[in-house]
Regions:
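Short hydrophobic targeting helices and cationic amphipathic motifs
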Residues: 3-5, 13-16, 30-33
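N-acyltransferase acceptor-side catalytic subdomain
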Residues: 24, 28-254
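Residue-level detector of alpha-helix boundary/anchor positions
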Residues: 2-3, 7-9, 178
Length: 254
């Protein structure tokens, strides 16, 4: 069954996103539902489809299960949905917050201290030179993979490496004296970048990666960087909240 839970007392058909291949073709009614307490969490089956994100929990959780196939991931990102879960003890969980935290590339904020770092030109930058090293460091830097809530496990790494291989995931590498100092990776669809993770092996390297990404996107008509969740660090660099409706308008206009 595709739909497992709906709002308490709901007796009318709910909705899910229907697709052909990886193309969004609209919202259709589905009679497959069962009542729960006071929220909706959908259990995905093997069909490449997602529930209407407006039906999710306040924290953005809309579904569990499914898989990390390229077709499902691309459909997810085209609708503002992304996977996030502890690979050690949880099934795949899918989120779509209604308040979207983004950075518009042309509005990236560079602090005075960070500008001084950049002016010293100690870093050099590449795009997609070593995606495998970047995602592996995002997983293991500072012992992240040892934490109970670690989310970037082998299955996720393999899924995003495949997206990279077929042209939908991008890495930014930051180098210092020929050594990898930091970087980030994410999904690229059209003129939008969906950030997944970043790391630093040297001070300021991940900030430098984000600034380089934003400036590169700004010079190539990039529309937005999806930061997924709000943090004070990203807020200080220009992150801001927009509505899901505005977010989707930007994605669909690309």
């Amino acid at each position: 069954m595709f739909l497992n839970f709906v709002f308490k007392g709901t007796k009318n058909p709910t909705h899910y996103i229907k697709v052909t291949g990886s193309k969004f073709i609209g919202i259709v009614n589905s009679p497959n539902f069962a009542t729960s307490l006071n929220y909706m969490v959908f259990r995905l089956d093997n069909r490449i489809a997602f529930p209407d994100p407006h039906l999710g929990e306040p924290d953005g959780l809309i579904a569990i299960g499914g898989d990390l196939s390229a077709e499902r991931l691309l459909l997810a990102y085209c609708n503002g949905i992304f996977p996030w879960y502890s690979f050690k003890n949880e099934t795949i969980m899918w989120f779509c917050p209604m308040d979207r935290f983004v950075i518009f590339p042309e509005k990236v904020r560079i602090s005075h201290s960070m500008r001084n770092v950049l002016n010293k030109s100690i870093f050099t930058y590449t795009i997609n030179k070593d995606f495998a090293a970047v995602i592996q460091n995002c997983s293991t830097a500072n012992g992240r993979h040892e934490l109970d809530g670690a989310w970037l496990g082998p299955d996720m790494i393999a899924a995003y490496q495949h997206l990279h291989n077929i042209g939908f995931a991008t890495s930014i590498e930051v180098w210092h004296d020929g050594q990898l100092a930091g970087g980030l990776y994410g999904v690229t669809i059209g003129h939008c970048f969906f950030g997944e993770s970043m790391f630093s092996l040297e001070p300021n390297a991940s900030k430098a990666a984000l600034i380089f990404l934003a400036q590169t996107m700004a010079s190539h008509s990039g529309r937005l960087i999806d930061c997924q969740f709000e943090t004070e660090h990203l807020k200080s660099m220009g992150g801001e909240k927009i509505s899901y409706e505005r977010y989707m308008e930007i994605l669909k206009s690309d």
